[in-house]
């Protein structure tokens, strides 16, 4: 069971993420061993490394979706585990690598054309429609709009986690993204990103290199 006192203490959490002597592994492959760092509030921390080095796996571990092999992860001194992670995720805003998953946020909400009960009956009887085409890929401007909107909606979140947020952005939009992330850090938040973009890596306060020898 999750300690009920944890929910109370979350209101007092600053947001610092600490990783100590961590072993990160997936599918029997060790991606990092003895990994230690602190992602402090008010700073931009960037996890970088080649494709397949474990950046996304590390982020998922820090969010409590994956167990840590050894060592520990804590948030302002409170131990983060798979069991306690749900409480901690309430104070996190997450931008996934596949940001297209949030594309519905760009679409206006449409009113239903029939009552929910009626829809349920007919939906069970009628043959399912076949989707013949996939949605068009989002343009860089639309992706940036999603990132901007997600960050704007995260005013009450103390920790910002973003997985390759600039992957599909133009250099100009990447620069604007950097300013957005900086604004979040300047507001006293913990900002943790995974990125291979030189601009983001160079302007991070702390850079964590992921490779087989980490």
Describe the function of each predicted region.
Residues 17, 32-34:
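Conserved structural motif at the start of ABC-family nucleotide-binding domains
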Residues 48-50:
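The feature captures the beta-strand-to-loop junction immediately N-terminal to the Walker
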Residues 63:
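Helix-to-loop junction immediately C-terminal to a conserved catalytic motif
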Residues 71-79, 88:
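Conserved ABC transporter NBD signature motif
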Residues 98-129:
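Q-loop/switch helix immediately C-terminal to the Walker
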Residues 162-165:
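Walker B catalytic motif
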Residues 197-202:
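Conserved H-loop
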């Amino acid at each position: 069971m999750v300690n009920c006192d944890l929910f109370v203490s979350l209101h007092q959490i600053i947001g610092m993420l600490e990783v100590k002597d961590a072993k990160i592994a997936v599918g029997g492959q060790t991606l990092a061993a003895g990994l230690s760092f602190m992602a402090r509030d008010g700073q931009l921390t960037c996890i970088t490394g080649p494709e397949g080095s474990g950046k996304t796996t590390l982020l998922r571990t820090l969010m409590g979706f994956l167990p840590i092999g050894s060592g520990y992860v804590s948030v302002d001194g409170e131990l983060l585990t798979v069991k306690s992670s749900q409480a901690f995720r309430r104070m996190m805003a997450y931008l996934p690598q596949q940001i297209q998953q949030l594309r519905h946020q760009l679409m206006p909400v449409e009113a239903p054309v029939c009552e929910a009960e009626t829809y349920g009956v007919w939906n069970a009887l009628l043959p399912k429609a076949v989707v013949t085409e996939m949605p068009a890929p989002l343009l860089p401007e639309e992706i940036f709009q999603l990132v901007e909107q997600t960050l704007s909606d995260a005013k009450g979140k103390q920790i910002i986690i973003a997985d390759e947020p600039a992957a599909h952005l133009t250099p100009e939009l990447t620069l604007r993204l950097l300013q957005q992330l900086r604004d979040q850090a300047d507001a006293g938040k913990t900002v943790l990103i995974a990125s291979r973009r030189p601009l983001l890596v160079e302007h991070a306060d702390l850079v964590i290199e992921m490779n087989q020898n980490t």
